[in-house]
């Protein structure tokens, strides 16, 4: 995570940005935590969505354990983790959610697969828990009630360690910002505050 955060700072330096707002979703939220804990003077406001601090604050579901599964089986398991309500009956009762059921199966691209595995390894060892009090930015932490990848308790843990933070929970899973129409509006409003 430290390298991802350093890359973000290098890009900001190249663009001439002394400080900036940050939006981190899932793995990006892990990177954002590392960024704000390591470079607190660079982050003005930050939104963390469906993410985890690692360590004693709670880790996200160990997705690396699914890497060896057949791609279609992995997609089916991932679906249930992404929203714990998703089962056959749910999709019968909520046909509008059928799009979530279509598995994204990527095969044949060895560089993509290699990148995915390296990302899984990075998140496997993510732990910024002890350094979260270093974060000085105003932070909105948001979780989906039915997220089986980054459970709400993990977002609440993050909020407990950052002095200037607000925790909100939305009706949805790991993609709550698509499922709950109020989420994106509130995220944008938070980032637009002076």
Predicted regions and their residues:
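Short alpha-helix in the alpha/beta-hydrolase fold that links the catalytic acid
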Residues: 128, 137, 151-160
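Short beta-strand/loop motif that positions the catalytic acidic residue
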Residues: 135, 141-143
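Acidic catalytic loop of the alpha/beta-hydrolase fold
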Residues: 145-150
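Flexible "cap/lid" loop of the alpha/beta hydrolase fold
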Residues: 33, 37, 44-73
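Conserved alpha/beta-hydrolase catalytic His-Asp/Glu region
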Residues: 57, 78-124, 131
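Active-site loop/oxyanion-hole signature of alpha/beta-hydrolase fold enzymes
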Residues: 1-23
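Gly/Ala-rich beta-loop-alpha elbow adjacent to hydrolase catalytic centers
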Residues: 24, 28, 32
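Catalytic active-site module of serine/aspartate enzymes centered on a nucleophile-bearing elbow/loop
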Residues: 164-194
């Amino acid at each position: 995570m430290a390298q991802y955060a350093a890359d973000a700072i290098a890009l900001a330096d190249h663009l001439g940005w002394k400080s900036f707002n940050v939006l981190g979703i899932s793995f990006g939220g892990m990177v954002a935590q590392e960024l704000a804990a390591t470079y607190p003077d660079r982050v003005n406001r930050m939104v963390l969505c469906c993410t985890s601090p690692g360590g004693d604050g709670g880790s996200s579901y160990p997705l690396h354990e699914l890497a060896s599964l057949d791609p279609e089986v992995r997609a089916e398991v991932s679906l249930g983790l992404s929203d714990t309500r998703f089962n056959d009956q749910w999709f019968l009762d909520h046909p509008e959610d059928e799009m979530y059921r279509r598995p994204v199966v990527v095969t044949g691209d060895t560089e993509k697969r290699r990148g995915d595995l390296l990302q899984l390894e990075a998140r496997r060892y993510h732990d910024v828990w002890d350094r979260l009090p270093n974060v000085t930015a105003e932070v909105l932490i948001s979780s989906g009630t039915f997220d089986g990848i980054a459970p709400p308790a993990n977002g609440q843990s993050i909020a407990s360690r950052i002095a200037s933070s607000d925790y909100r929970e939305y009706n949805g899973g790991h993609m709550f910002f698509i499922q709950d129409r109020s989420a994106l509006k509130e995220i944008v409003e938070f980032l637009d505050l002076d």
